[in-house]
Amino acid sequence: ATLDLVCAARWGYKRGALAKKKFIAIAGNIGAGKTELTSFLCRKYGLTPFFEPNEANPYLADFYKDMKTWAFRSQLFFLTAKFRLQRQLERSSGTTLQDRTLYEDAEIFAKNLHRQRYIDKRDWQMYWDLYETFSQTLAPPDLMIYLRCPVKTLRQRIRLRGREMEQDIPTPYLNRLNTLYEEWFSGYKLSPVLVLPTDKLDYVTDLVDRVDLFRQIEKHL
């Protein structure tokens, strides 16, 4: 801990950047490292985490087995759950970190399922109208951190973390999601964006990577 502080001071990192009330969102494909980064930052600096409610989604396991049947219901659950979660974090004091926002659910995951015709035109229009209504009432993030990661690395991490429902996710599905992430961030204007190549960073054990991460976050806030 002492070494962290010495190096952080040398590189210009200030804890004050995260001590103020800020909303940081962490985005990235399945297996990109969102939960790990959220947990790491919150553990190191006492921030408040808001994790994705995967385990609370009663449709998710069925969705991975039969996407066409369960896509709309699963995405609708995530949209409404994320809306309630984001309203909750707006009332929190201090800096909060959210592991995947409702923007990402709609712009990446639901849009991909609609393009694959797993969500039909009628359901999609209703979903999108609801998303636009929700998003207009929410304060956007102060910083969006995008964890960019190649599909090969995503597959390795998915296998290693061993979540049973994720093991049969098709590689083309992950490829399509990565494409949508790049499309979305090319036109994203809600907040500053910090792009991190997570297949090349080791902020957990590498002190230089860790200090560089803190410097970049501070720079964008």
Predicted features along the sequence, with ranges:
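Hydrophobic anchor at the beta1->P-loop junction of P-loop NTPases
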Residues: 26
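P-loop (Walker A) phosphate-binding loop of NTP-binding proteins
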Residues: 29
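Conserved lysine of the Walker
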Residues: 34
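Conserved substrate/cofactor phosphate-moiety recognition/catalytic segment
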Residues: 43-81
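NTP-dependent small-molecule kinase module
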Residues: 155-221
